Amino acid sequence: MTLNNYYDLAIIGGGASGLTAGITAGRSGMNTVILERLSRTGKKILATGNGRCNLSNNNITLADCETSLNSETVSKVLESFGNAEHFFRSLGLICRTDESGRIYPYSLNATAVLDALRLEISRLGVEETVDFKVTAIRKENGKFAVISEDGRKVIAENIIVTAGGCSGQSMGTDGQFFDVLRKLGHSVTPLKPALCPIKSNSPFLKSLKGLRVHANVSLLDSEKKIIASENGEVQFGEDVLSGICIFNLASKAEKGMIVSLNLMPEYSVQQVNRLIRHFQKLRSDTVAENLLTGILNKRIAQIILKECDIPLSKNVSEISVKQLNLLTEKLGNWTFEVSDKAAEWKNSQVTKGGISGTETDEFLQSTKIKGLSFAGEIIDINWKCGGYNLHWAWASAQYAVKSIKKHQKGD
């Protein structure tokens, strides 16, 4: 069954990118349909930012992403879109910005974002076809035929794929569409969970579960070389390290690497050592368990003392210089070996990998199939935590549609 005789544009995937593409196409007068595999568009938007929808970040730069796309292309996308608040104000949604540059809907409710997007889709007359799981794309009489699992067919002059990656599988992004694109001759770079916890087999994590600590966090390779660093709050789970700073390192983490926490980054090694020696004199008549009181959470302090082989019941005055030096080192380099990333896709916020940037041109169009474009997470690009990935979703979708329209005009 054919839903309509012909569309200027078929958008595959009704998430953040798909809805933005639909709005941009509708505003430019294109006859457009959004094809969504779930029973409703935009479901994943509701889960972003813990339900508050961190929709952008004022500090976004090219340095905040990992990608195989040409850097000039990414820069053009960001420059073309500009400030996300302007786009959302055009939808009737006002925003607020926190001290870190993270942009949220003023209501701090993700539903407001989705409602604004869908209201504009409706106003523009853009069709939304749900429960349409695309299983094949082929050419018929020079046009694209998009085929659903149940045999329905949509004919379109152009296609934008906004089907997402593999993260958030309960919300429609299970990576299935990469198989469709592979059959069309496209390459997919290795797919890995990103913005997710990092697993460790440290025997102490179970005792640390539920605690948080502020630290400078570094990811080290097998030669102890720093791969990347972040600063922020680390959350301890039963077998994982979590928190935004950990999420931002996860895409680079591999089994056998080391996560190093500097628990006192504002102090030099010498300053930490002098401070501990001062505390030893100050608390010489008490036990080691109390040595780090005033510096660290008690449970964290106990674990670190144990790792330094300092019995908690040992008199502080009896702690040796060697043990104090080891403790100093541990406070600046508390290590956890990576056993694996928390590899279930359900625990990741975005996907590392996707359609290779070498197979998309400067307009986010396929270099293999004329009329096929990509936007959002389907492309091999992932951004750090804090609204950056959603910014890319909006920006790349708008850019891809504008590029199609530009080429239609022959510019």
Regions found by a protein language model. Name each.
Residues 3-17:
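Beta1/beta-strand and adjacent pyrophosphate-binding region of the FAD-binding site
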Residues 5-7, 149-158, 229-230:
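Core beta-strand elements of the Rossmann-like FAD/NAD(P) dinucleotide-binding domain
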Residues 130, 302-382:
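A glycine-rich dinucleotide-binding beta-alpha-beta segment and adjacent secondary-structure elements
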Residues 10, 26-50:
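Glycine-rich FAD pyrophosphate-binding loop
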Residues 39-41, 46-47, 55, 59-62, ...:
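An anion/pyrophosphate-binding glycine-rich loop and adjacent beta-alpha core
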